[in-house]
Amino acid sequence: MIYTKRLWFSNGIHHHYSTKKILPNINIEYFETLINNTDVNLLPLEKDQTVKELLVFLCPLIFDPNVDSHKVVLDQDIDMIKSSATNFYENISQSEVEEFHKEEINNNSTKPVSHGLNSKLLKKSNKIAERIWKEGGMYSAAIEKIIYWLKKAVTVAENEIQRQPFDKLIEFYKSGNMKIWDEYNIIWIQDTESIVDMVNGFIEVYNDPLGYRGSFESVVSIKDFEATKRIKTISDNALWFEDHSPIADKYKKKKCSWYFSKGNHSCCGIW
């Protein structure tokens, strides 16, 4: 049960920080006994798959420390894509991924988009394909549910500046267009008044060894007015902290711009 709880906490067989594979404190024989004595109807069998075939698939993944040893490998001396257990890529090498994005990235753009943030790259018949995470694309069933609830949120938005990001995010999930994702974020960051806030999308990229693809995250938070007041007090006095910081005067700023920040009373989310 300890092993099960560790998997729940880390959302998989790899530790959420070290990304190292979590090994169970039981042996294979005991695990096989548990599976063989479980009702077949309760096992996650593929079509026409036998219990024996399921065990052949599962046992190396669970017990062999050399199989998918790390979710993310950052050793630049080896192929980081092939060495990582992340599912953002399939049958493709690091050099192929880098070359794929090199062709589409415009370094001269004043508003570059995050190419690859919402897609999976795979190679079939020596051709690289990109599967976009959107309505009608990869993960469509789940994304349609997201769109459903965002449409509900539109009807109860506190104000116009809160409603606009909802509409834009729906547009993004329908199209998968990363330019729309940028437009959404620009609108979202301008909402400094709403009591309820939301973060939703394929955002954090640390599960991708190359930092292209984002993992889904959704958080709803409620503003803590007292905490926000304290944070604003610090922000309003930023120049005082700059003046009294233990660094050489030539490195100190003469003027500090105030930025918006807020404290959250409570959060509810999934990562």
Regions found by a protein language model. Name each.
Residues 1-104:
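Extended, Lys/Arg-rich, non-catalytic nucleic-acid recognition/anchoring regions
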Residues 61-271:
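Fold-level signature of zinc-dependent metallopeptidase catalytic domains
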